[in-house]
Amino acid sequence: MKVIVLLLVLAVMQPVIQSQPFPGTGELPMTRRPPKKELEYWCTYAKSCDFCWNCRHGVCKNKVFEKHPLIKKNDYIQICRVSRYNERCSYFTDTRIRRFHIMSCTNPTYYDWFDELMQVKEDRVIDTENIKHTCLCMIATIALIGYIRKQYSRMQLQAATRLLIFLGLYVLLGILMTNIIMNLPLSTDNPMQMRRPPERDLKFWCTYAKHCDFCWTCKDGMCKNKVFSDHPIITQNDYIVNCTVSRWHDRCMYEAHFRIHYQHNMNCSQPKDLEWFIELKRHVINQDDL
């Protein structure tokens, strides 16, 4: 009970503690936006943070670097918090997936947390050997569960111990089944591989998977849409994500490859435009900070 009370007190005090300045020289409390005089510093090393951008009608201009190209308002721009304590400067993204970076204030290093978050392999091929291994493990698990159930009456164990054993086995079985389902063949021409779409299918995929890299041609940091010529040119950033696609009968699927893989399945003849990237990175913006 004492531990629970202590945790509740800490939870209540946390906002108060965060709002207080850090002790020492040159302190900056954990705040959503740095002072204007420090914008050039922070926007050099935290380029994706929202306090570096002025957005209007879906187009964003960099507050600090006038020569920076205009970009479309998208999820490359993240809500950030910054702080400074003596020679330690830090910033992190205030999203569901929080990314923290601490650096020396006098000798900072540029760290693209978003780039690392989105780091992926160029192609993903389903490993058939892994599927075989998973199936064997599932069969062995089912056999083990059957054996334990048969010996249930002979086991001289407490009821709680028996329950934990069965729960553990069923969780393992569930994990194995999920692994198999996620590796089911989905492509008719090459059922064991997700791949880039052919040129003739680009218009379809780029309508419903707008962020996928196969929809864009990038050169010197500027990206042009391959399909829709009237789409504005955007700067090359992590709004564009590596993707692979697959089609099986009337089931179409595309997958975004980053550390948290996201898959979207849809009816090929009646597809649904799903902004998976926006849903994943959705966050609440404090209107007072706009």
From Swiss-Prot:
List the membrane topology term(s). Multi-pass membrane protein
Its primary localisation, in coarse terms, equals: host cell
Q: Which InterPro entries match?
A: ASFV_fam_110
- State the taxonomy lineage: Viruses, Varidnaviria, Bamfordvirae, Nucleocytoviricota, Pokkesviricetes
Decide whether keyword Transmembrane helix is in the record: yes
The molecule here is called Protein MGF 110-9L
User: Could you tell me where this protein is found in the cell?
Assistant: Host membrane
TM segments?
1-19, 128-148, 163-183
Entry GO CC: host cell membrane; membrane
Pfam families xrefs: v110 (PF01639)
Q: What does this protein do?
A: Plays a role in virus cell tropism, and may be required for efficient virus replication in macrophages.
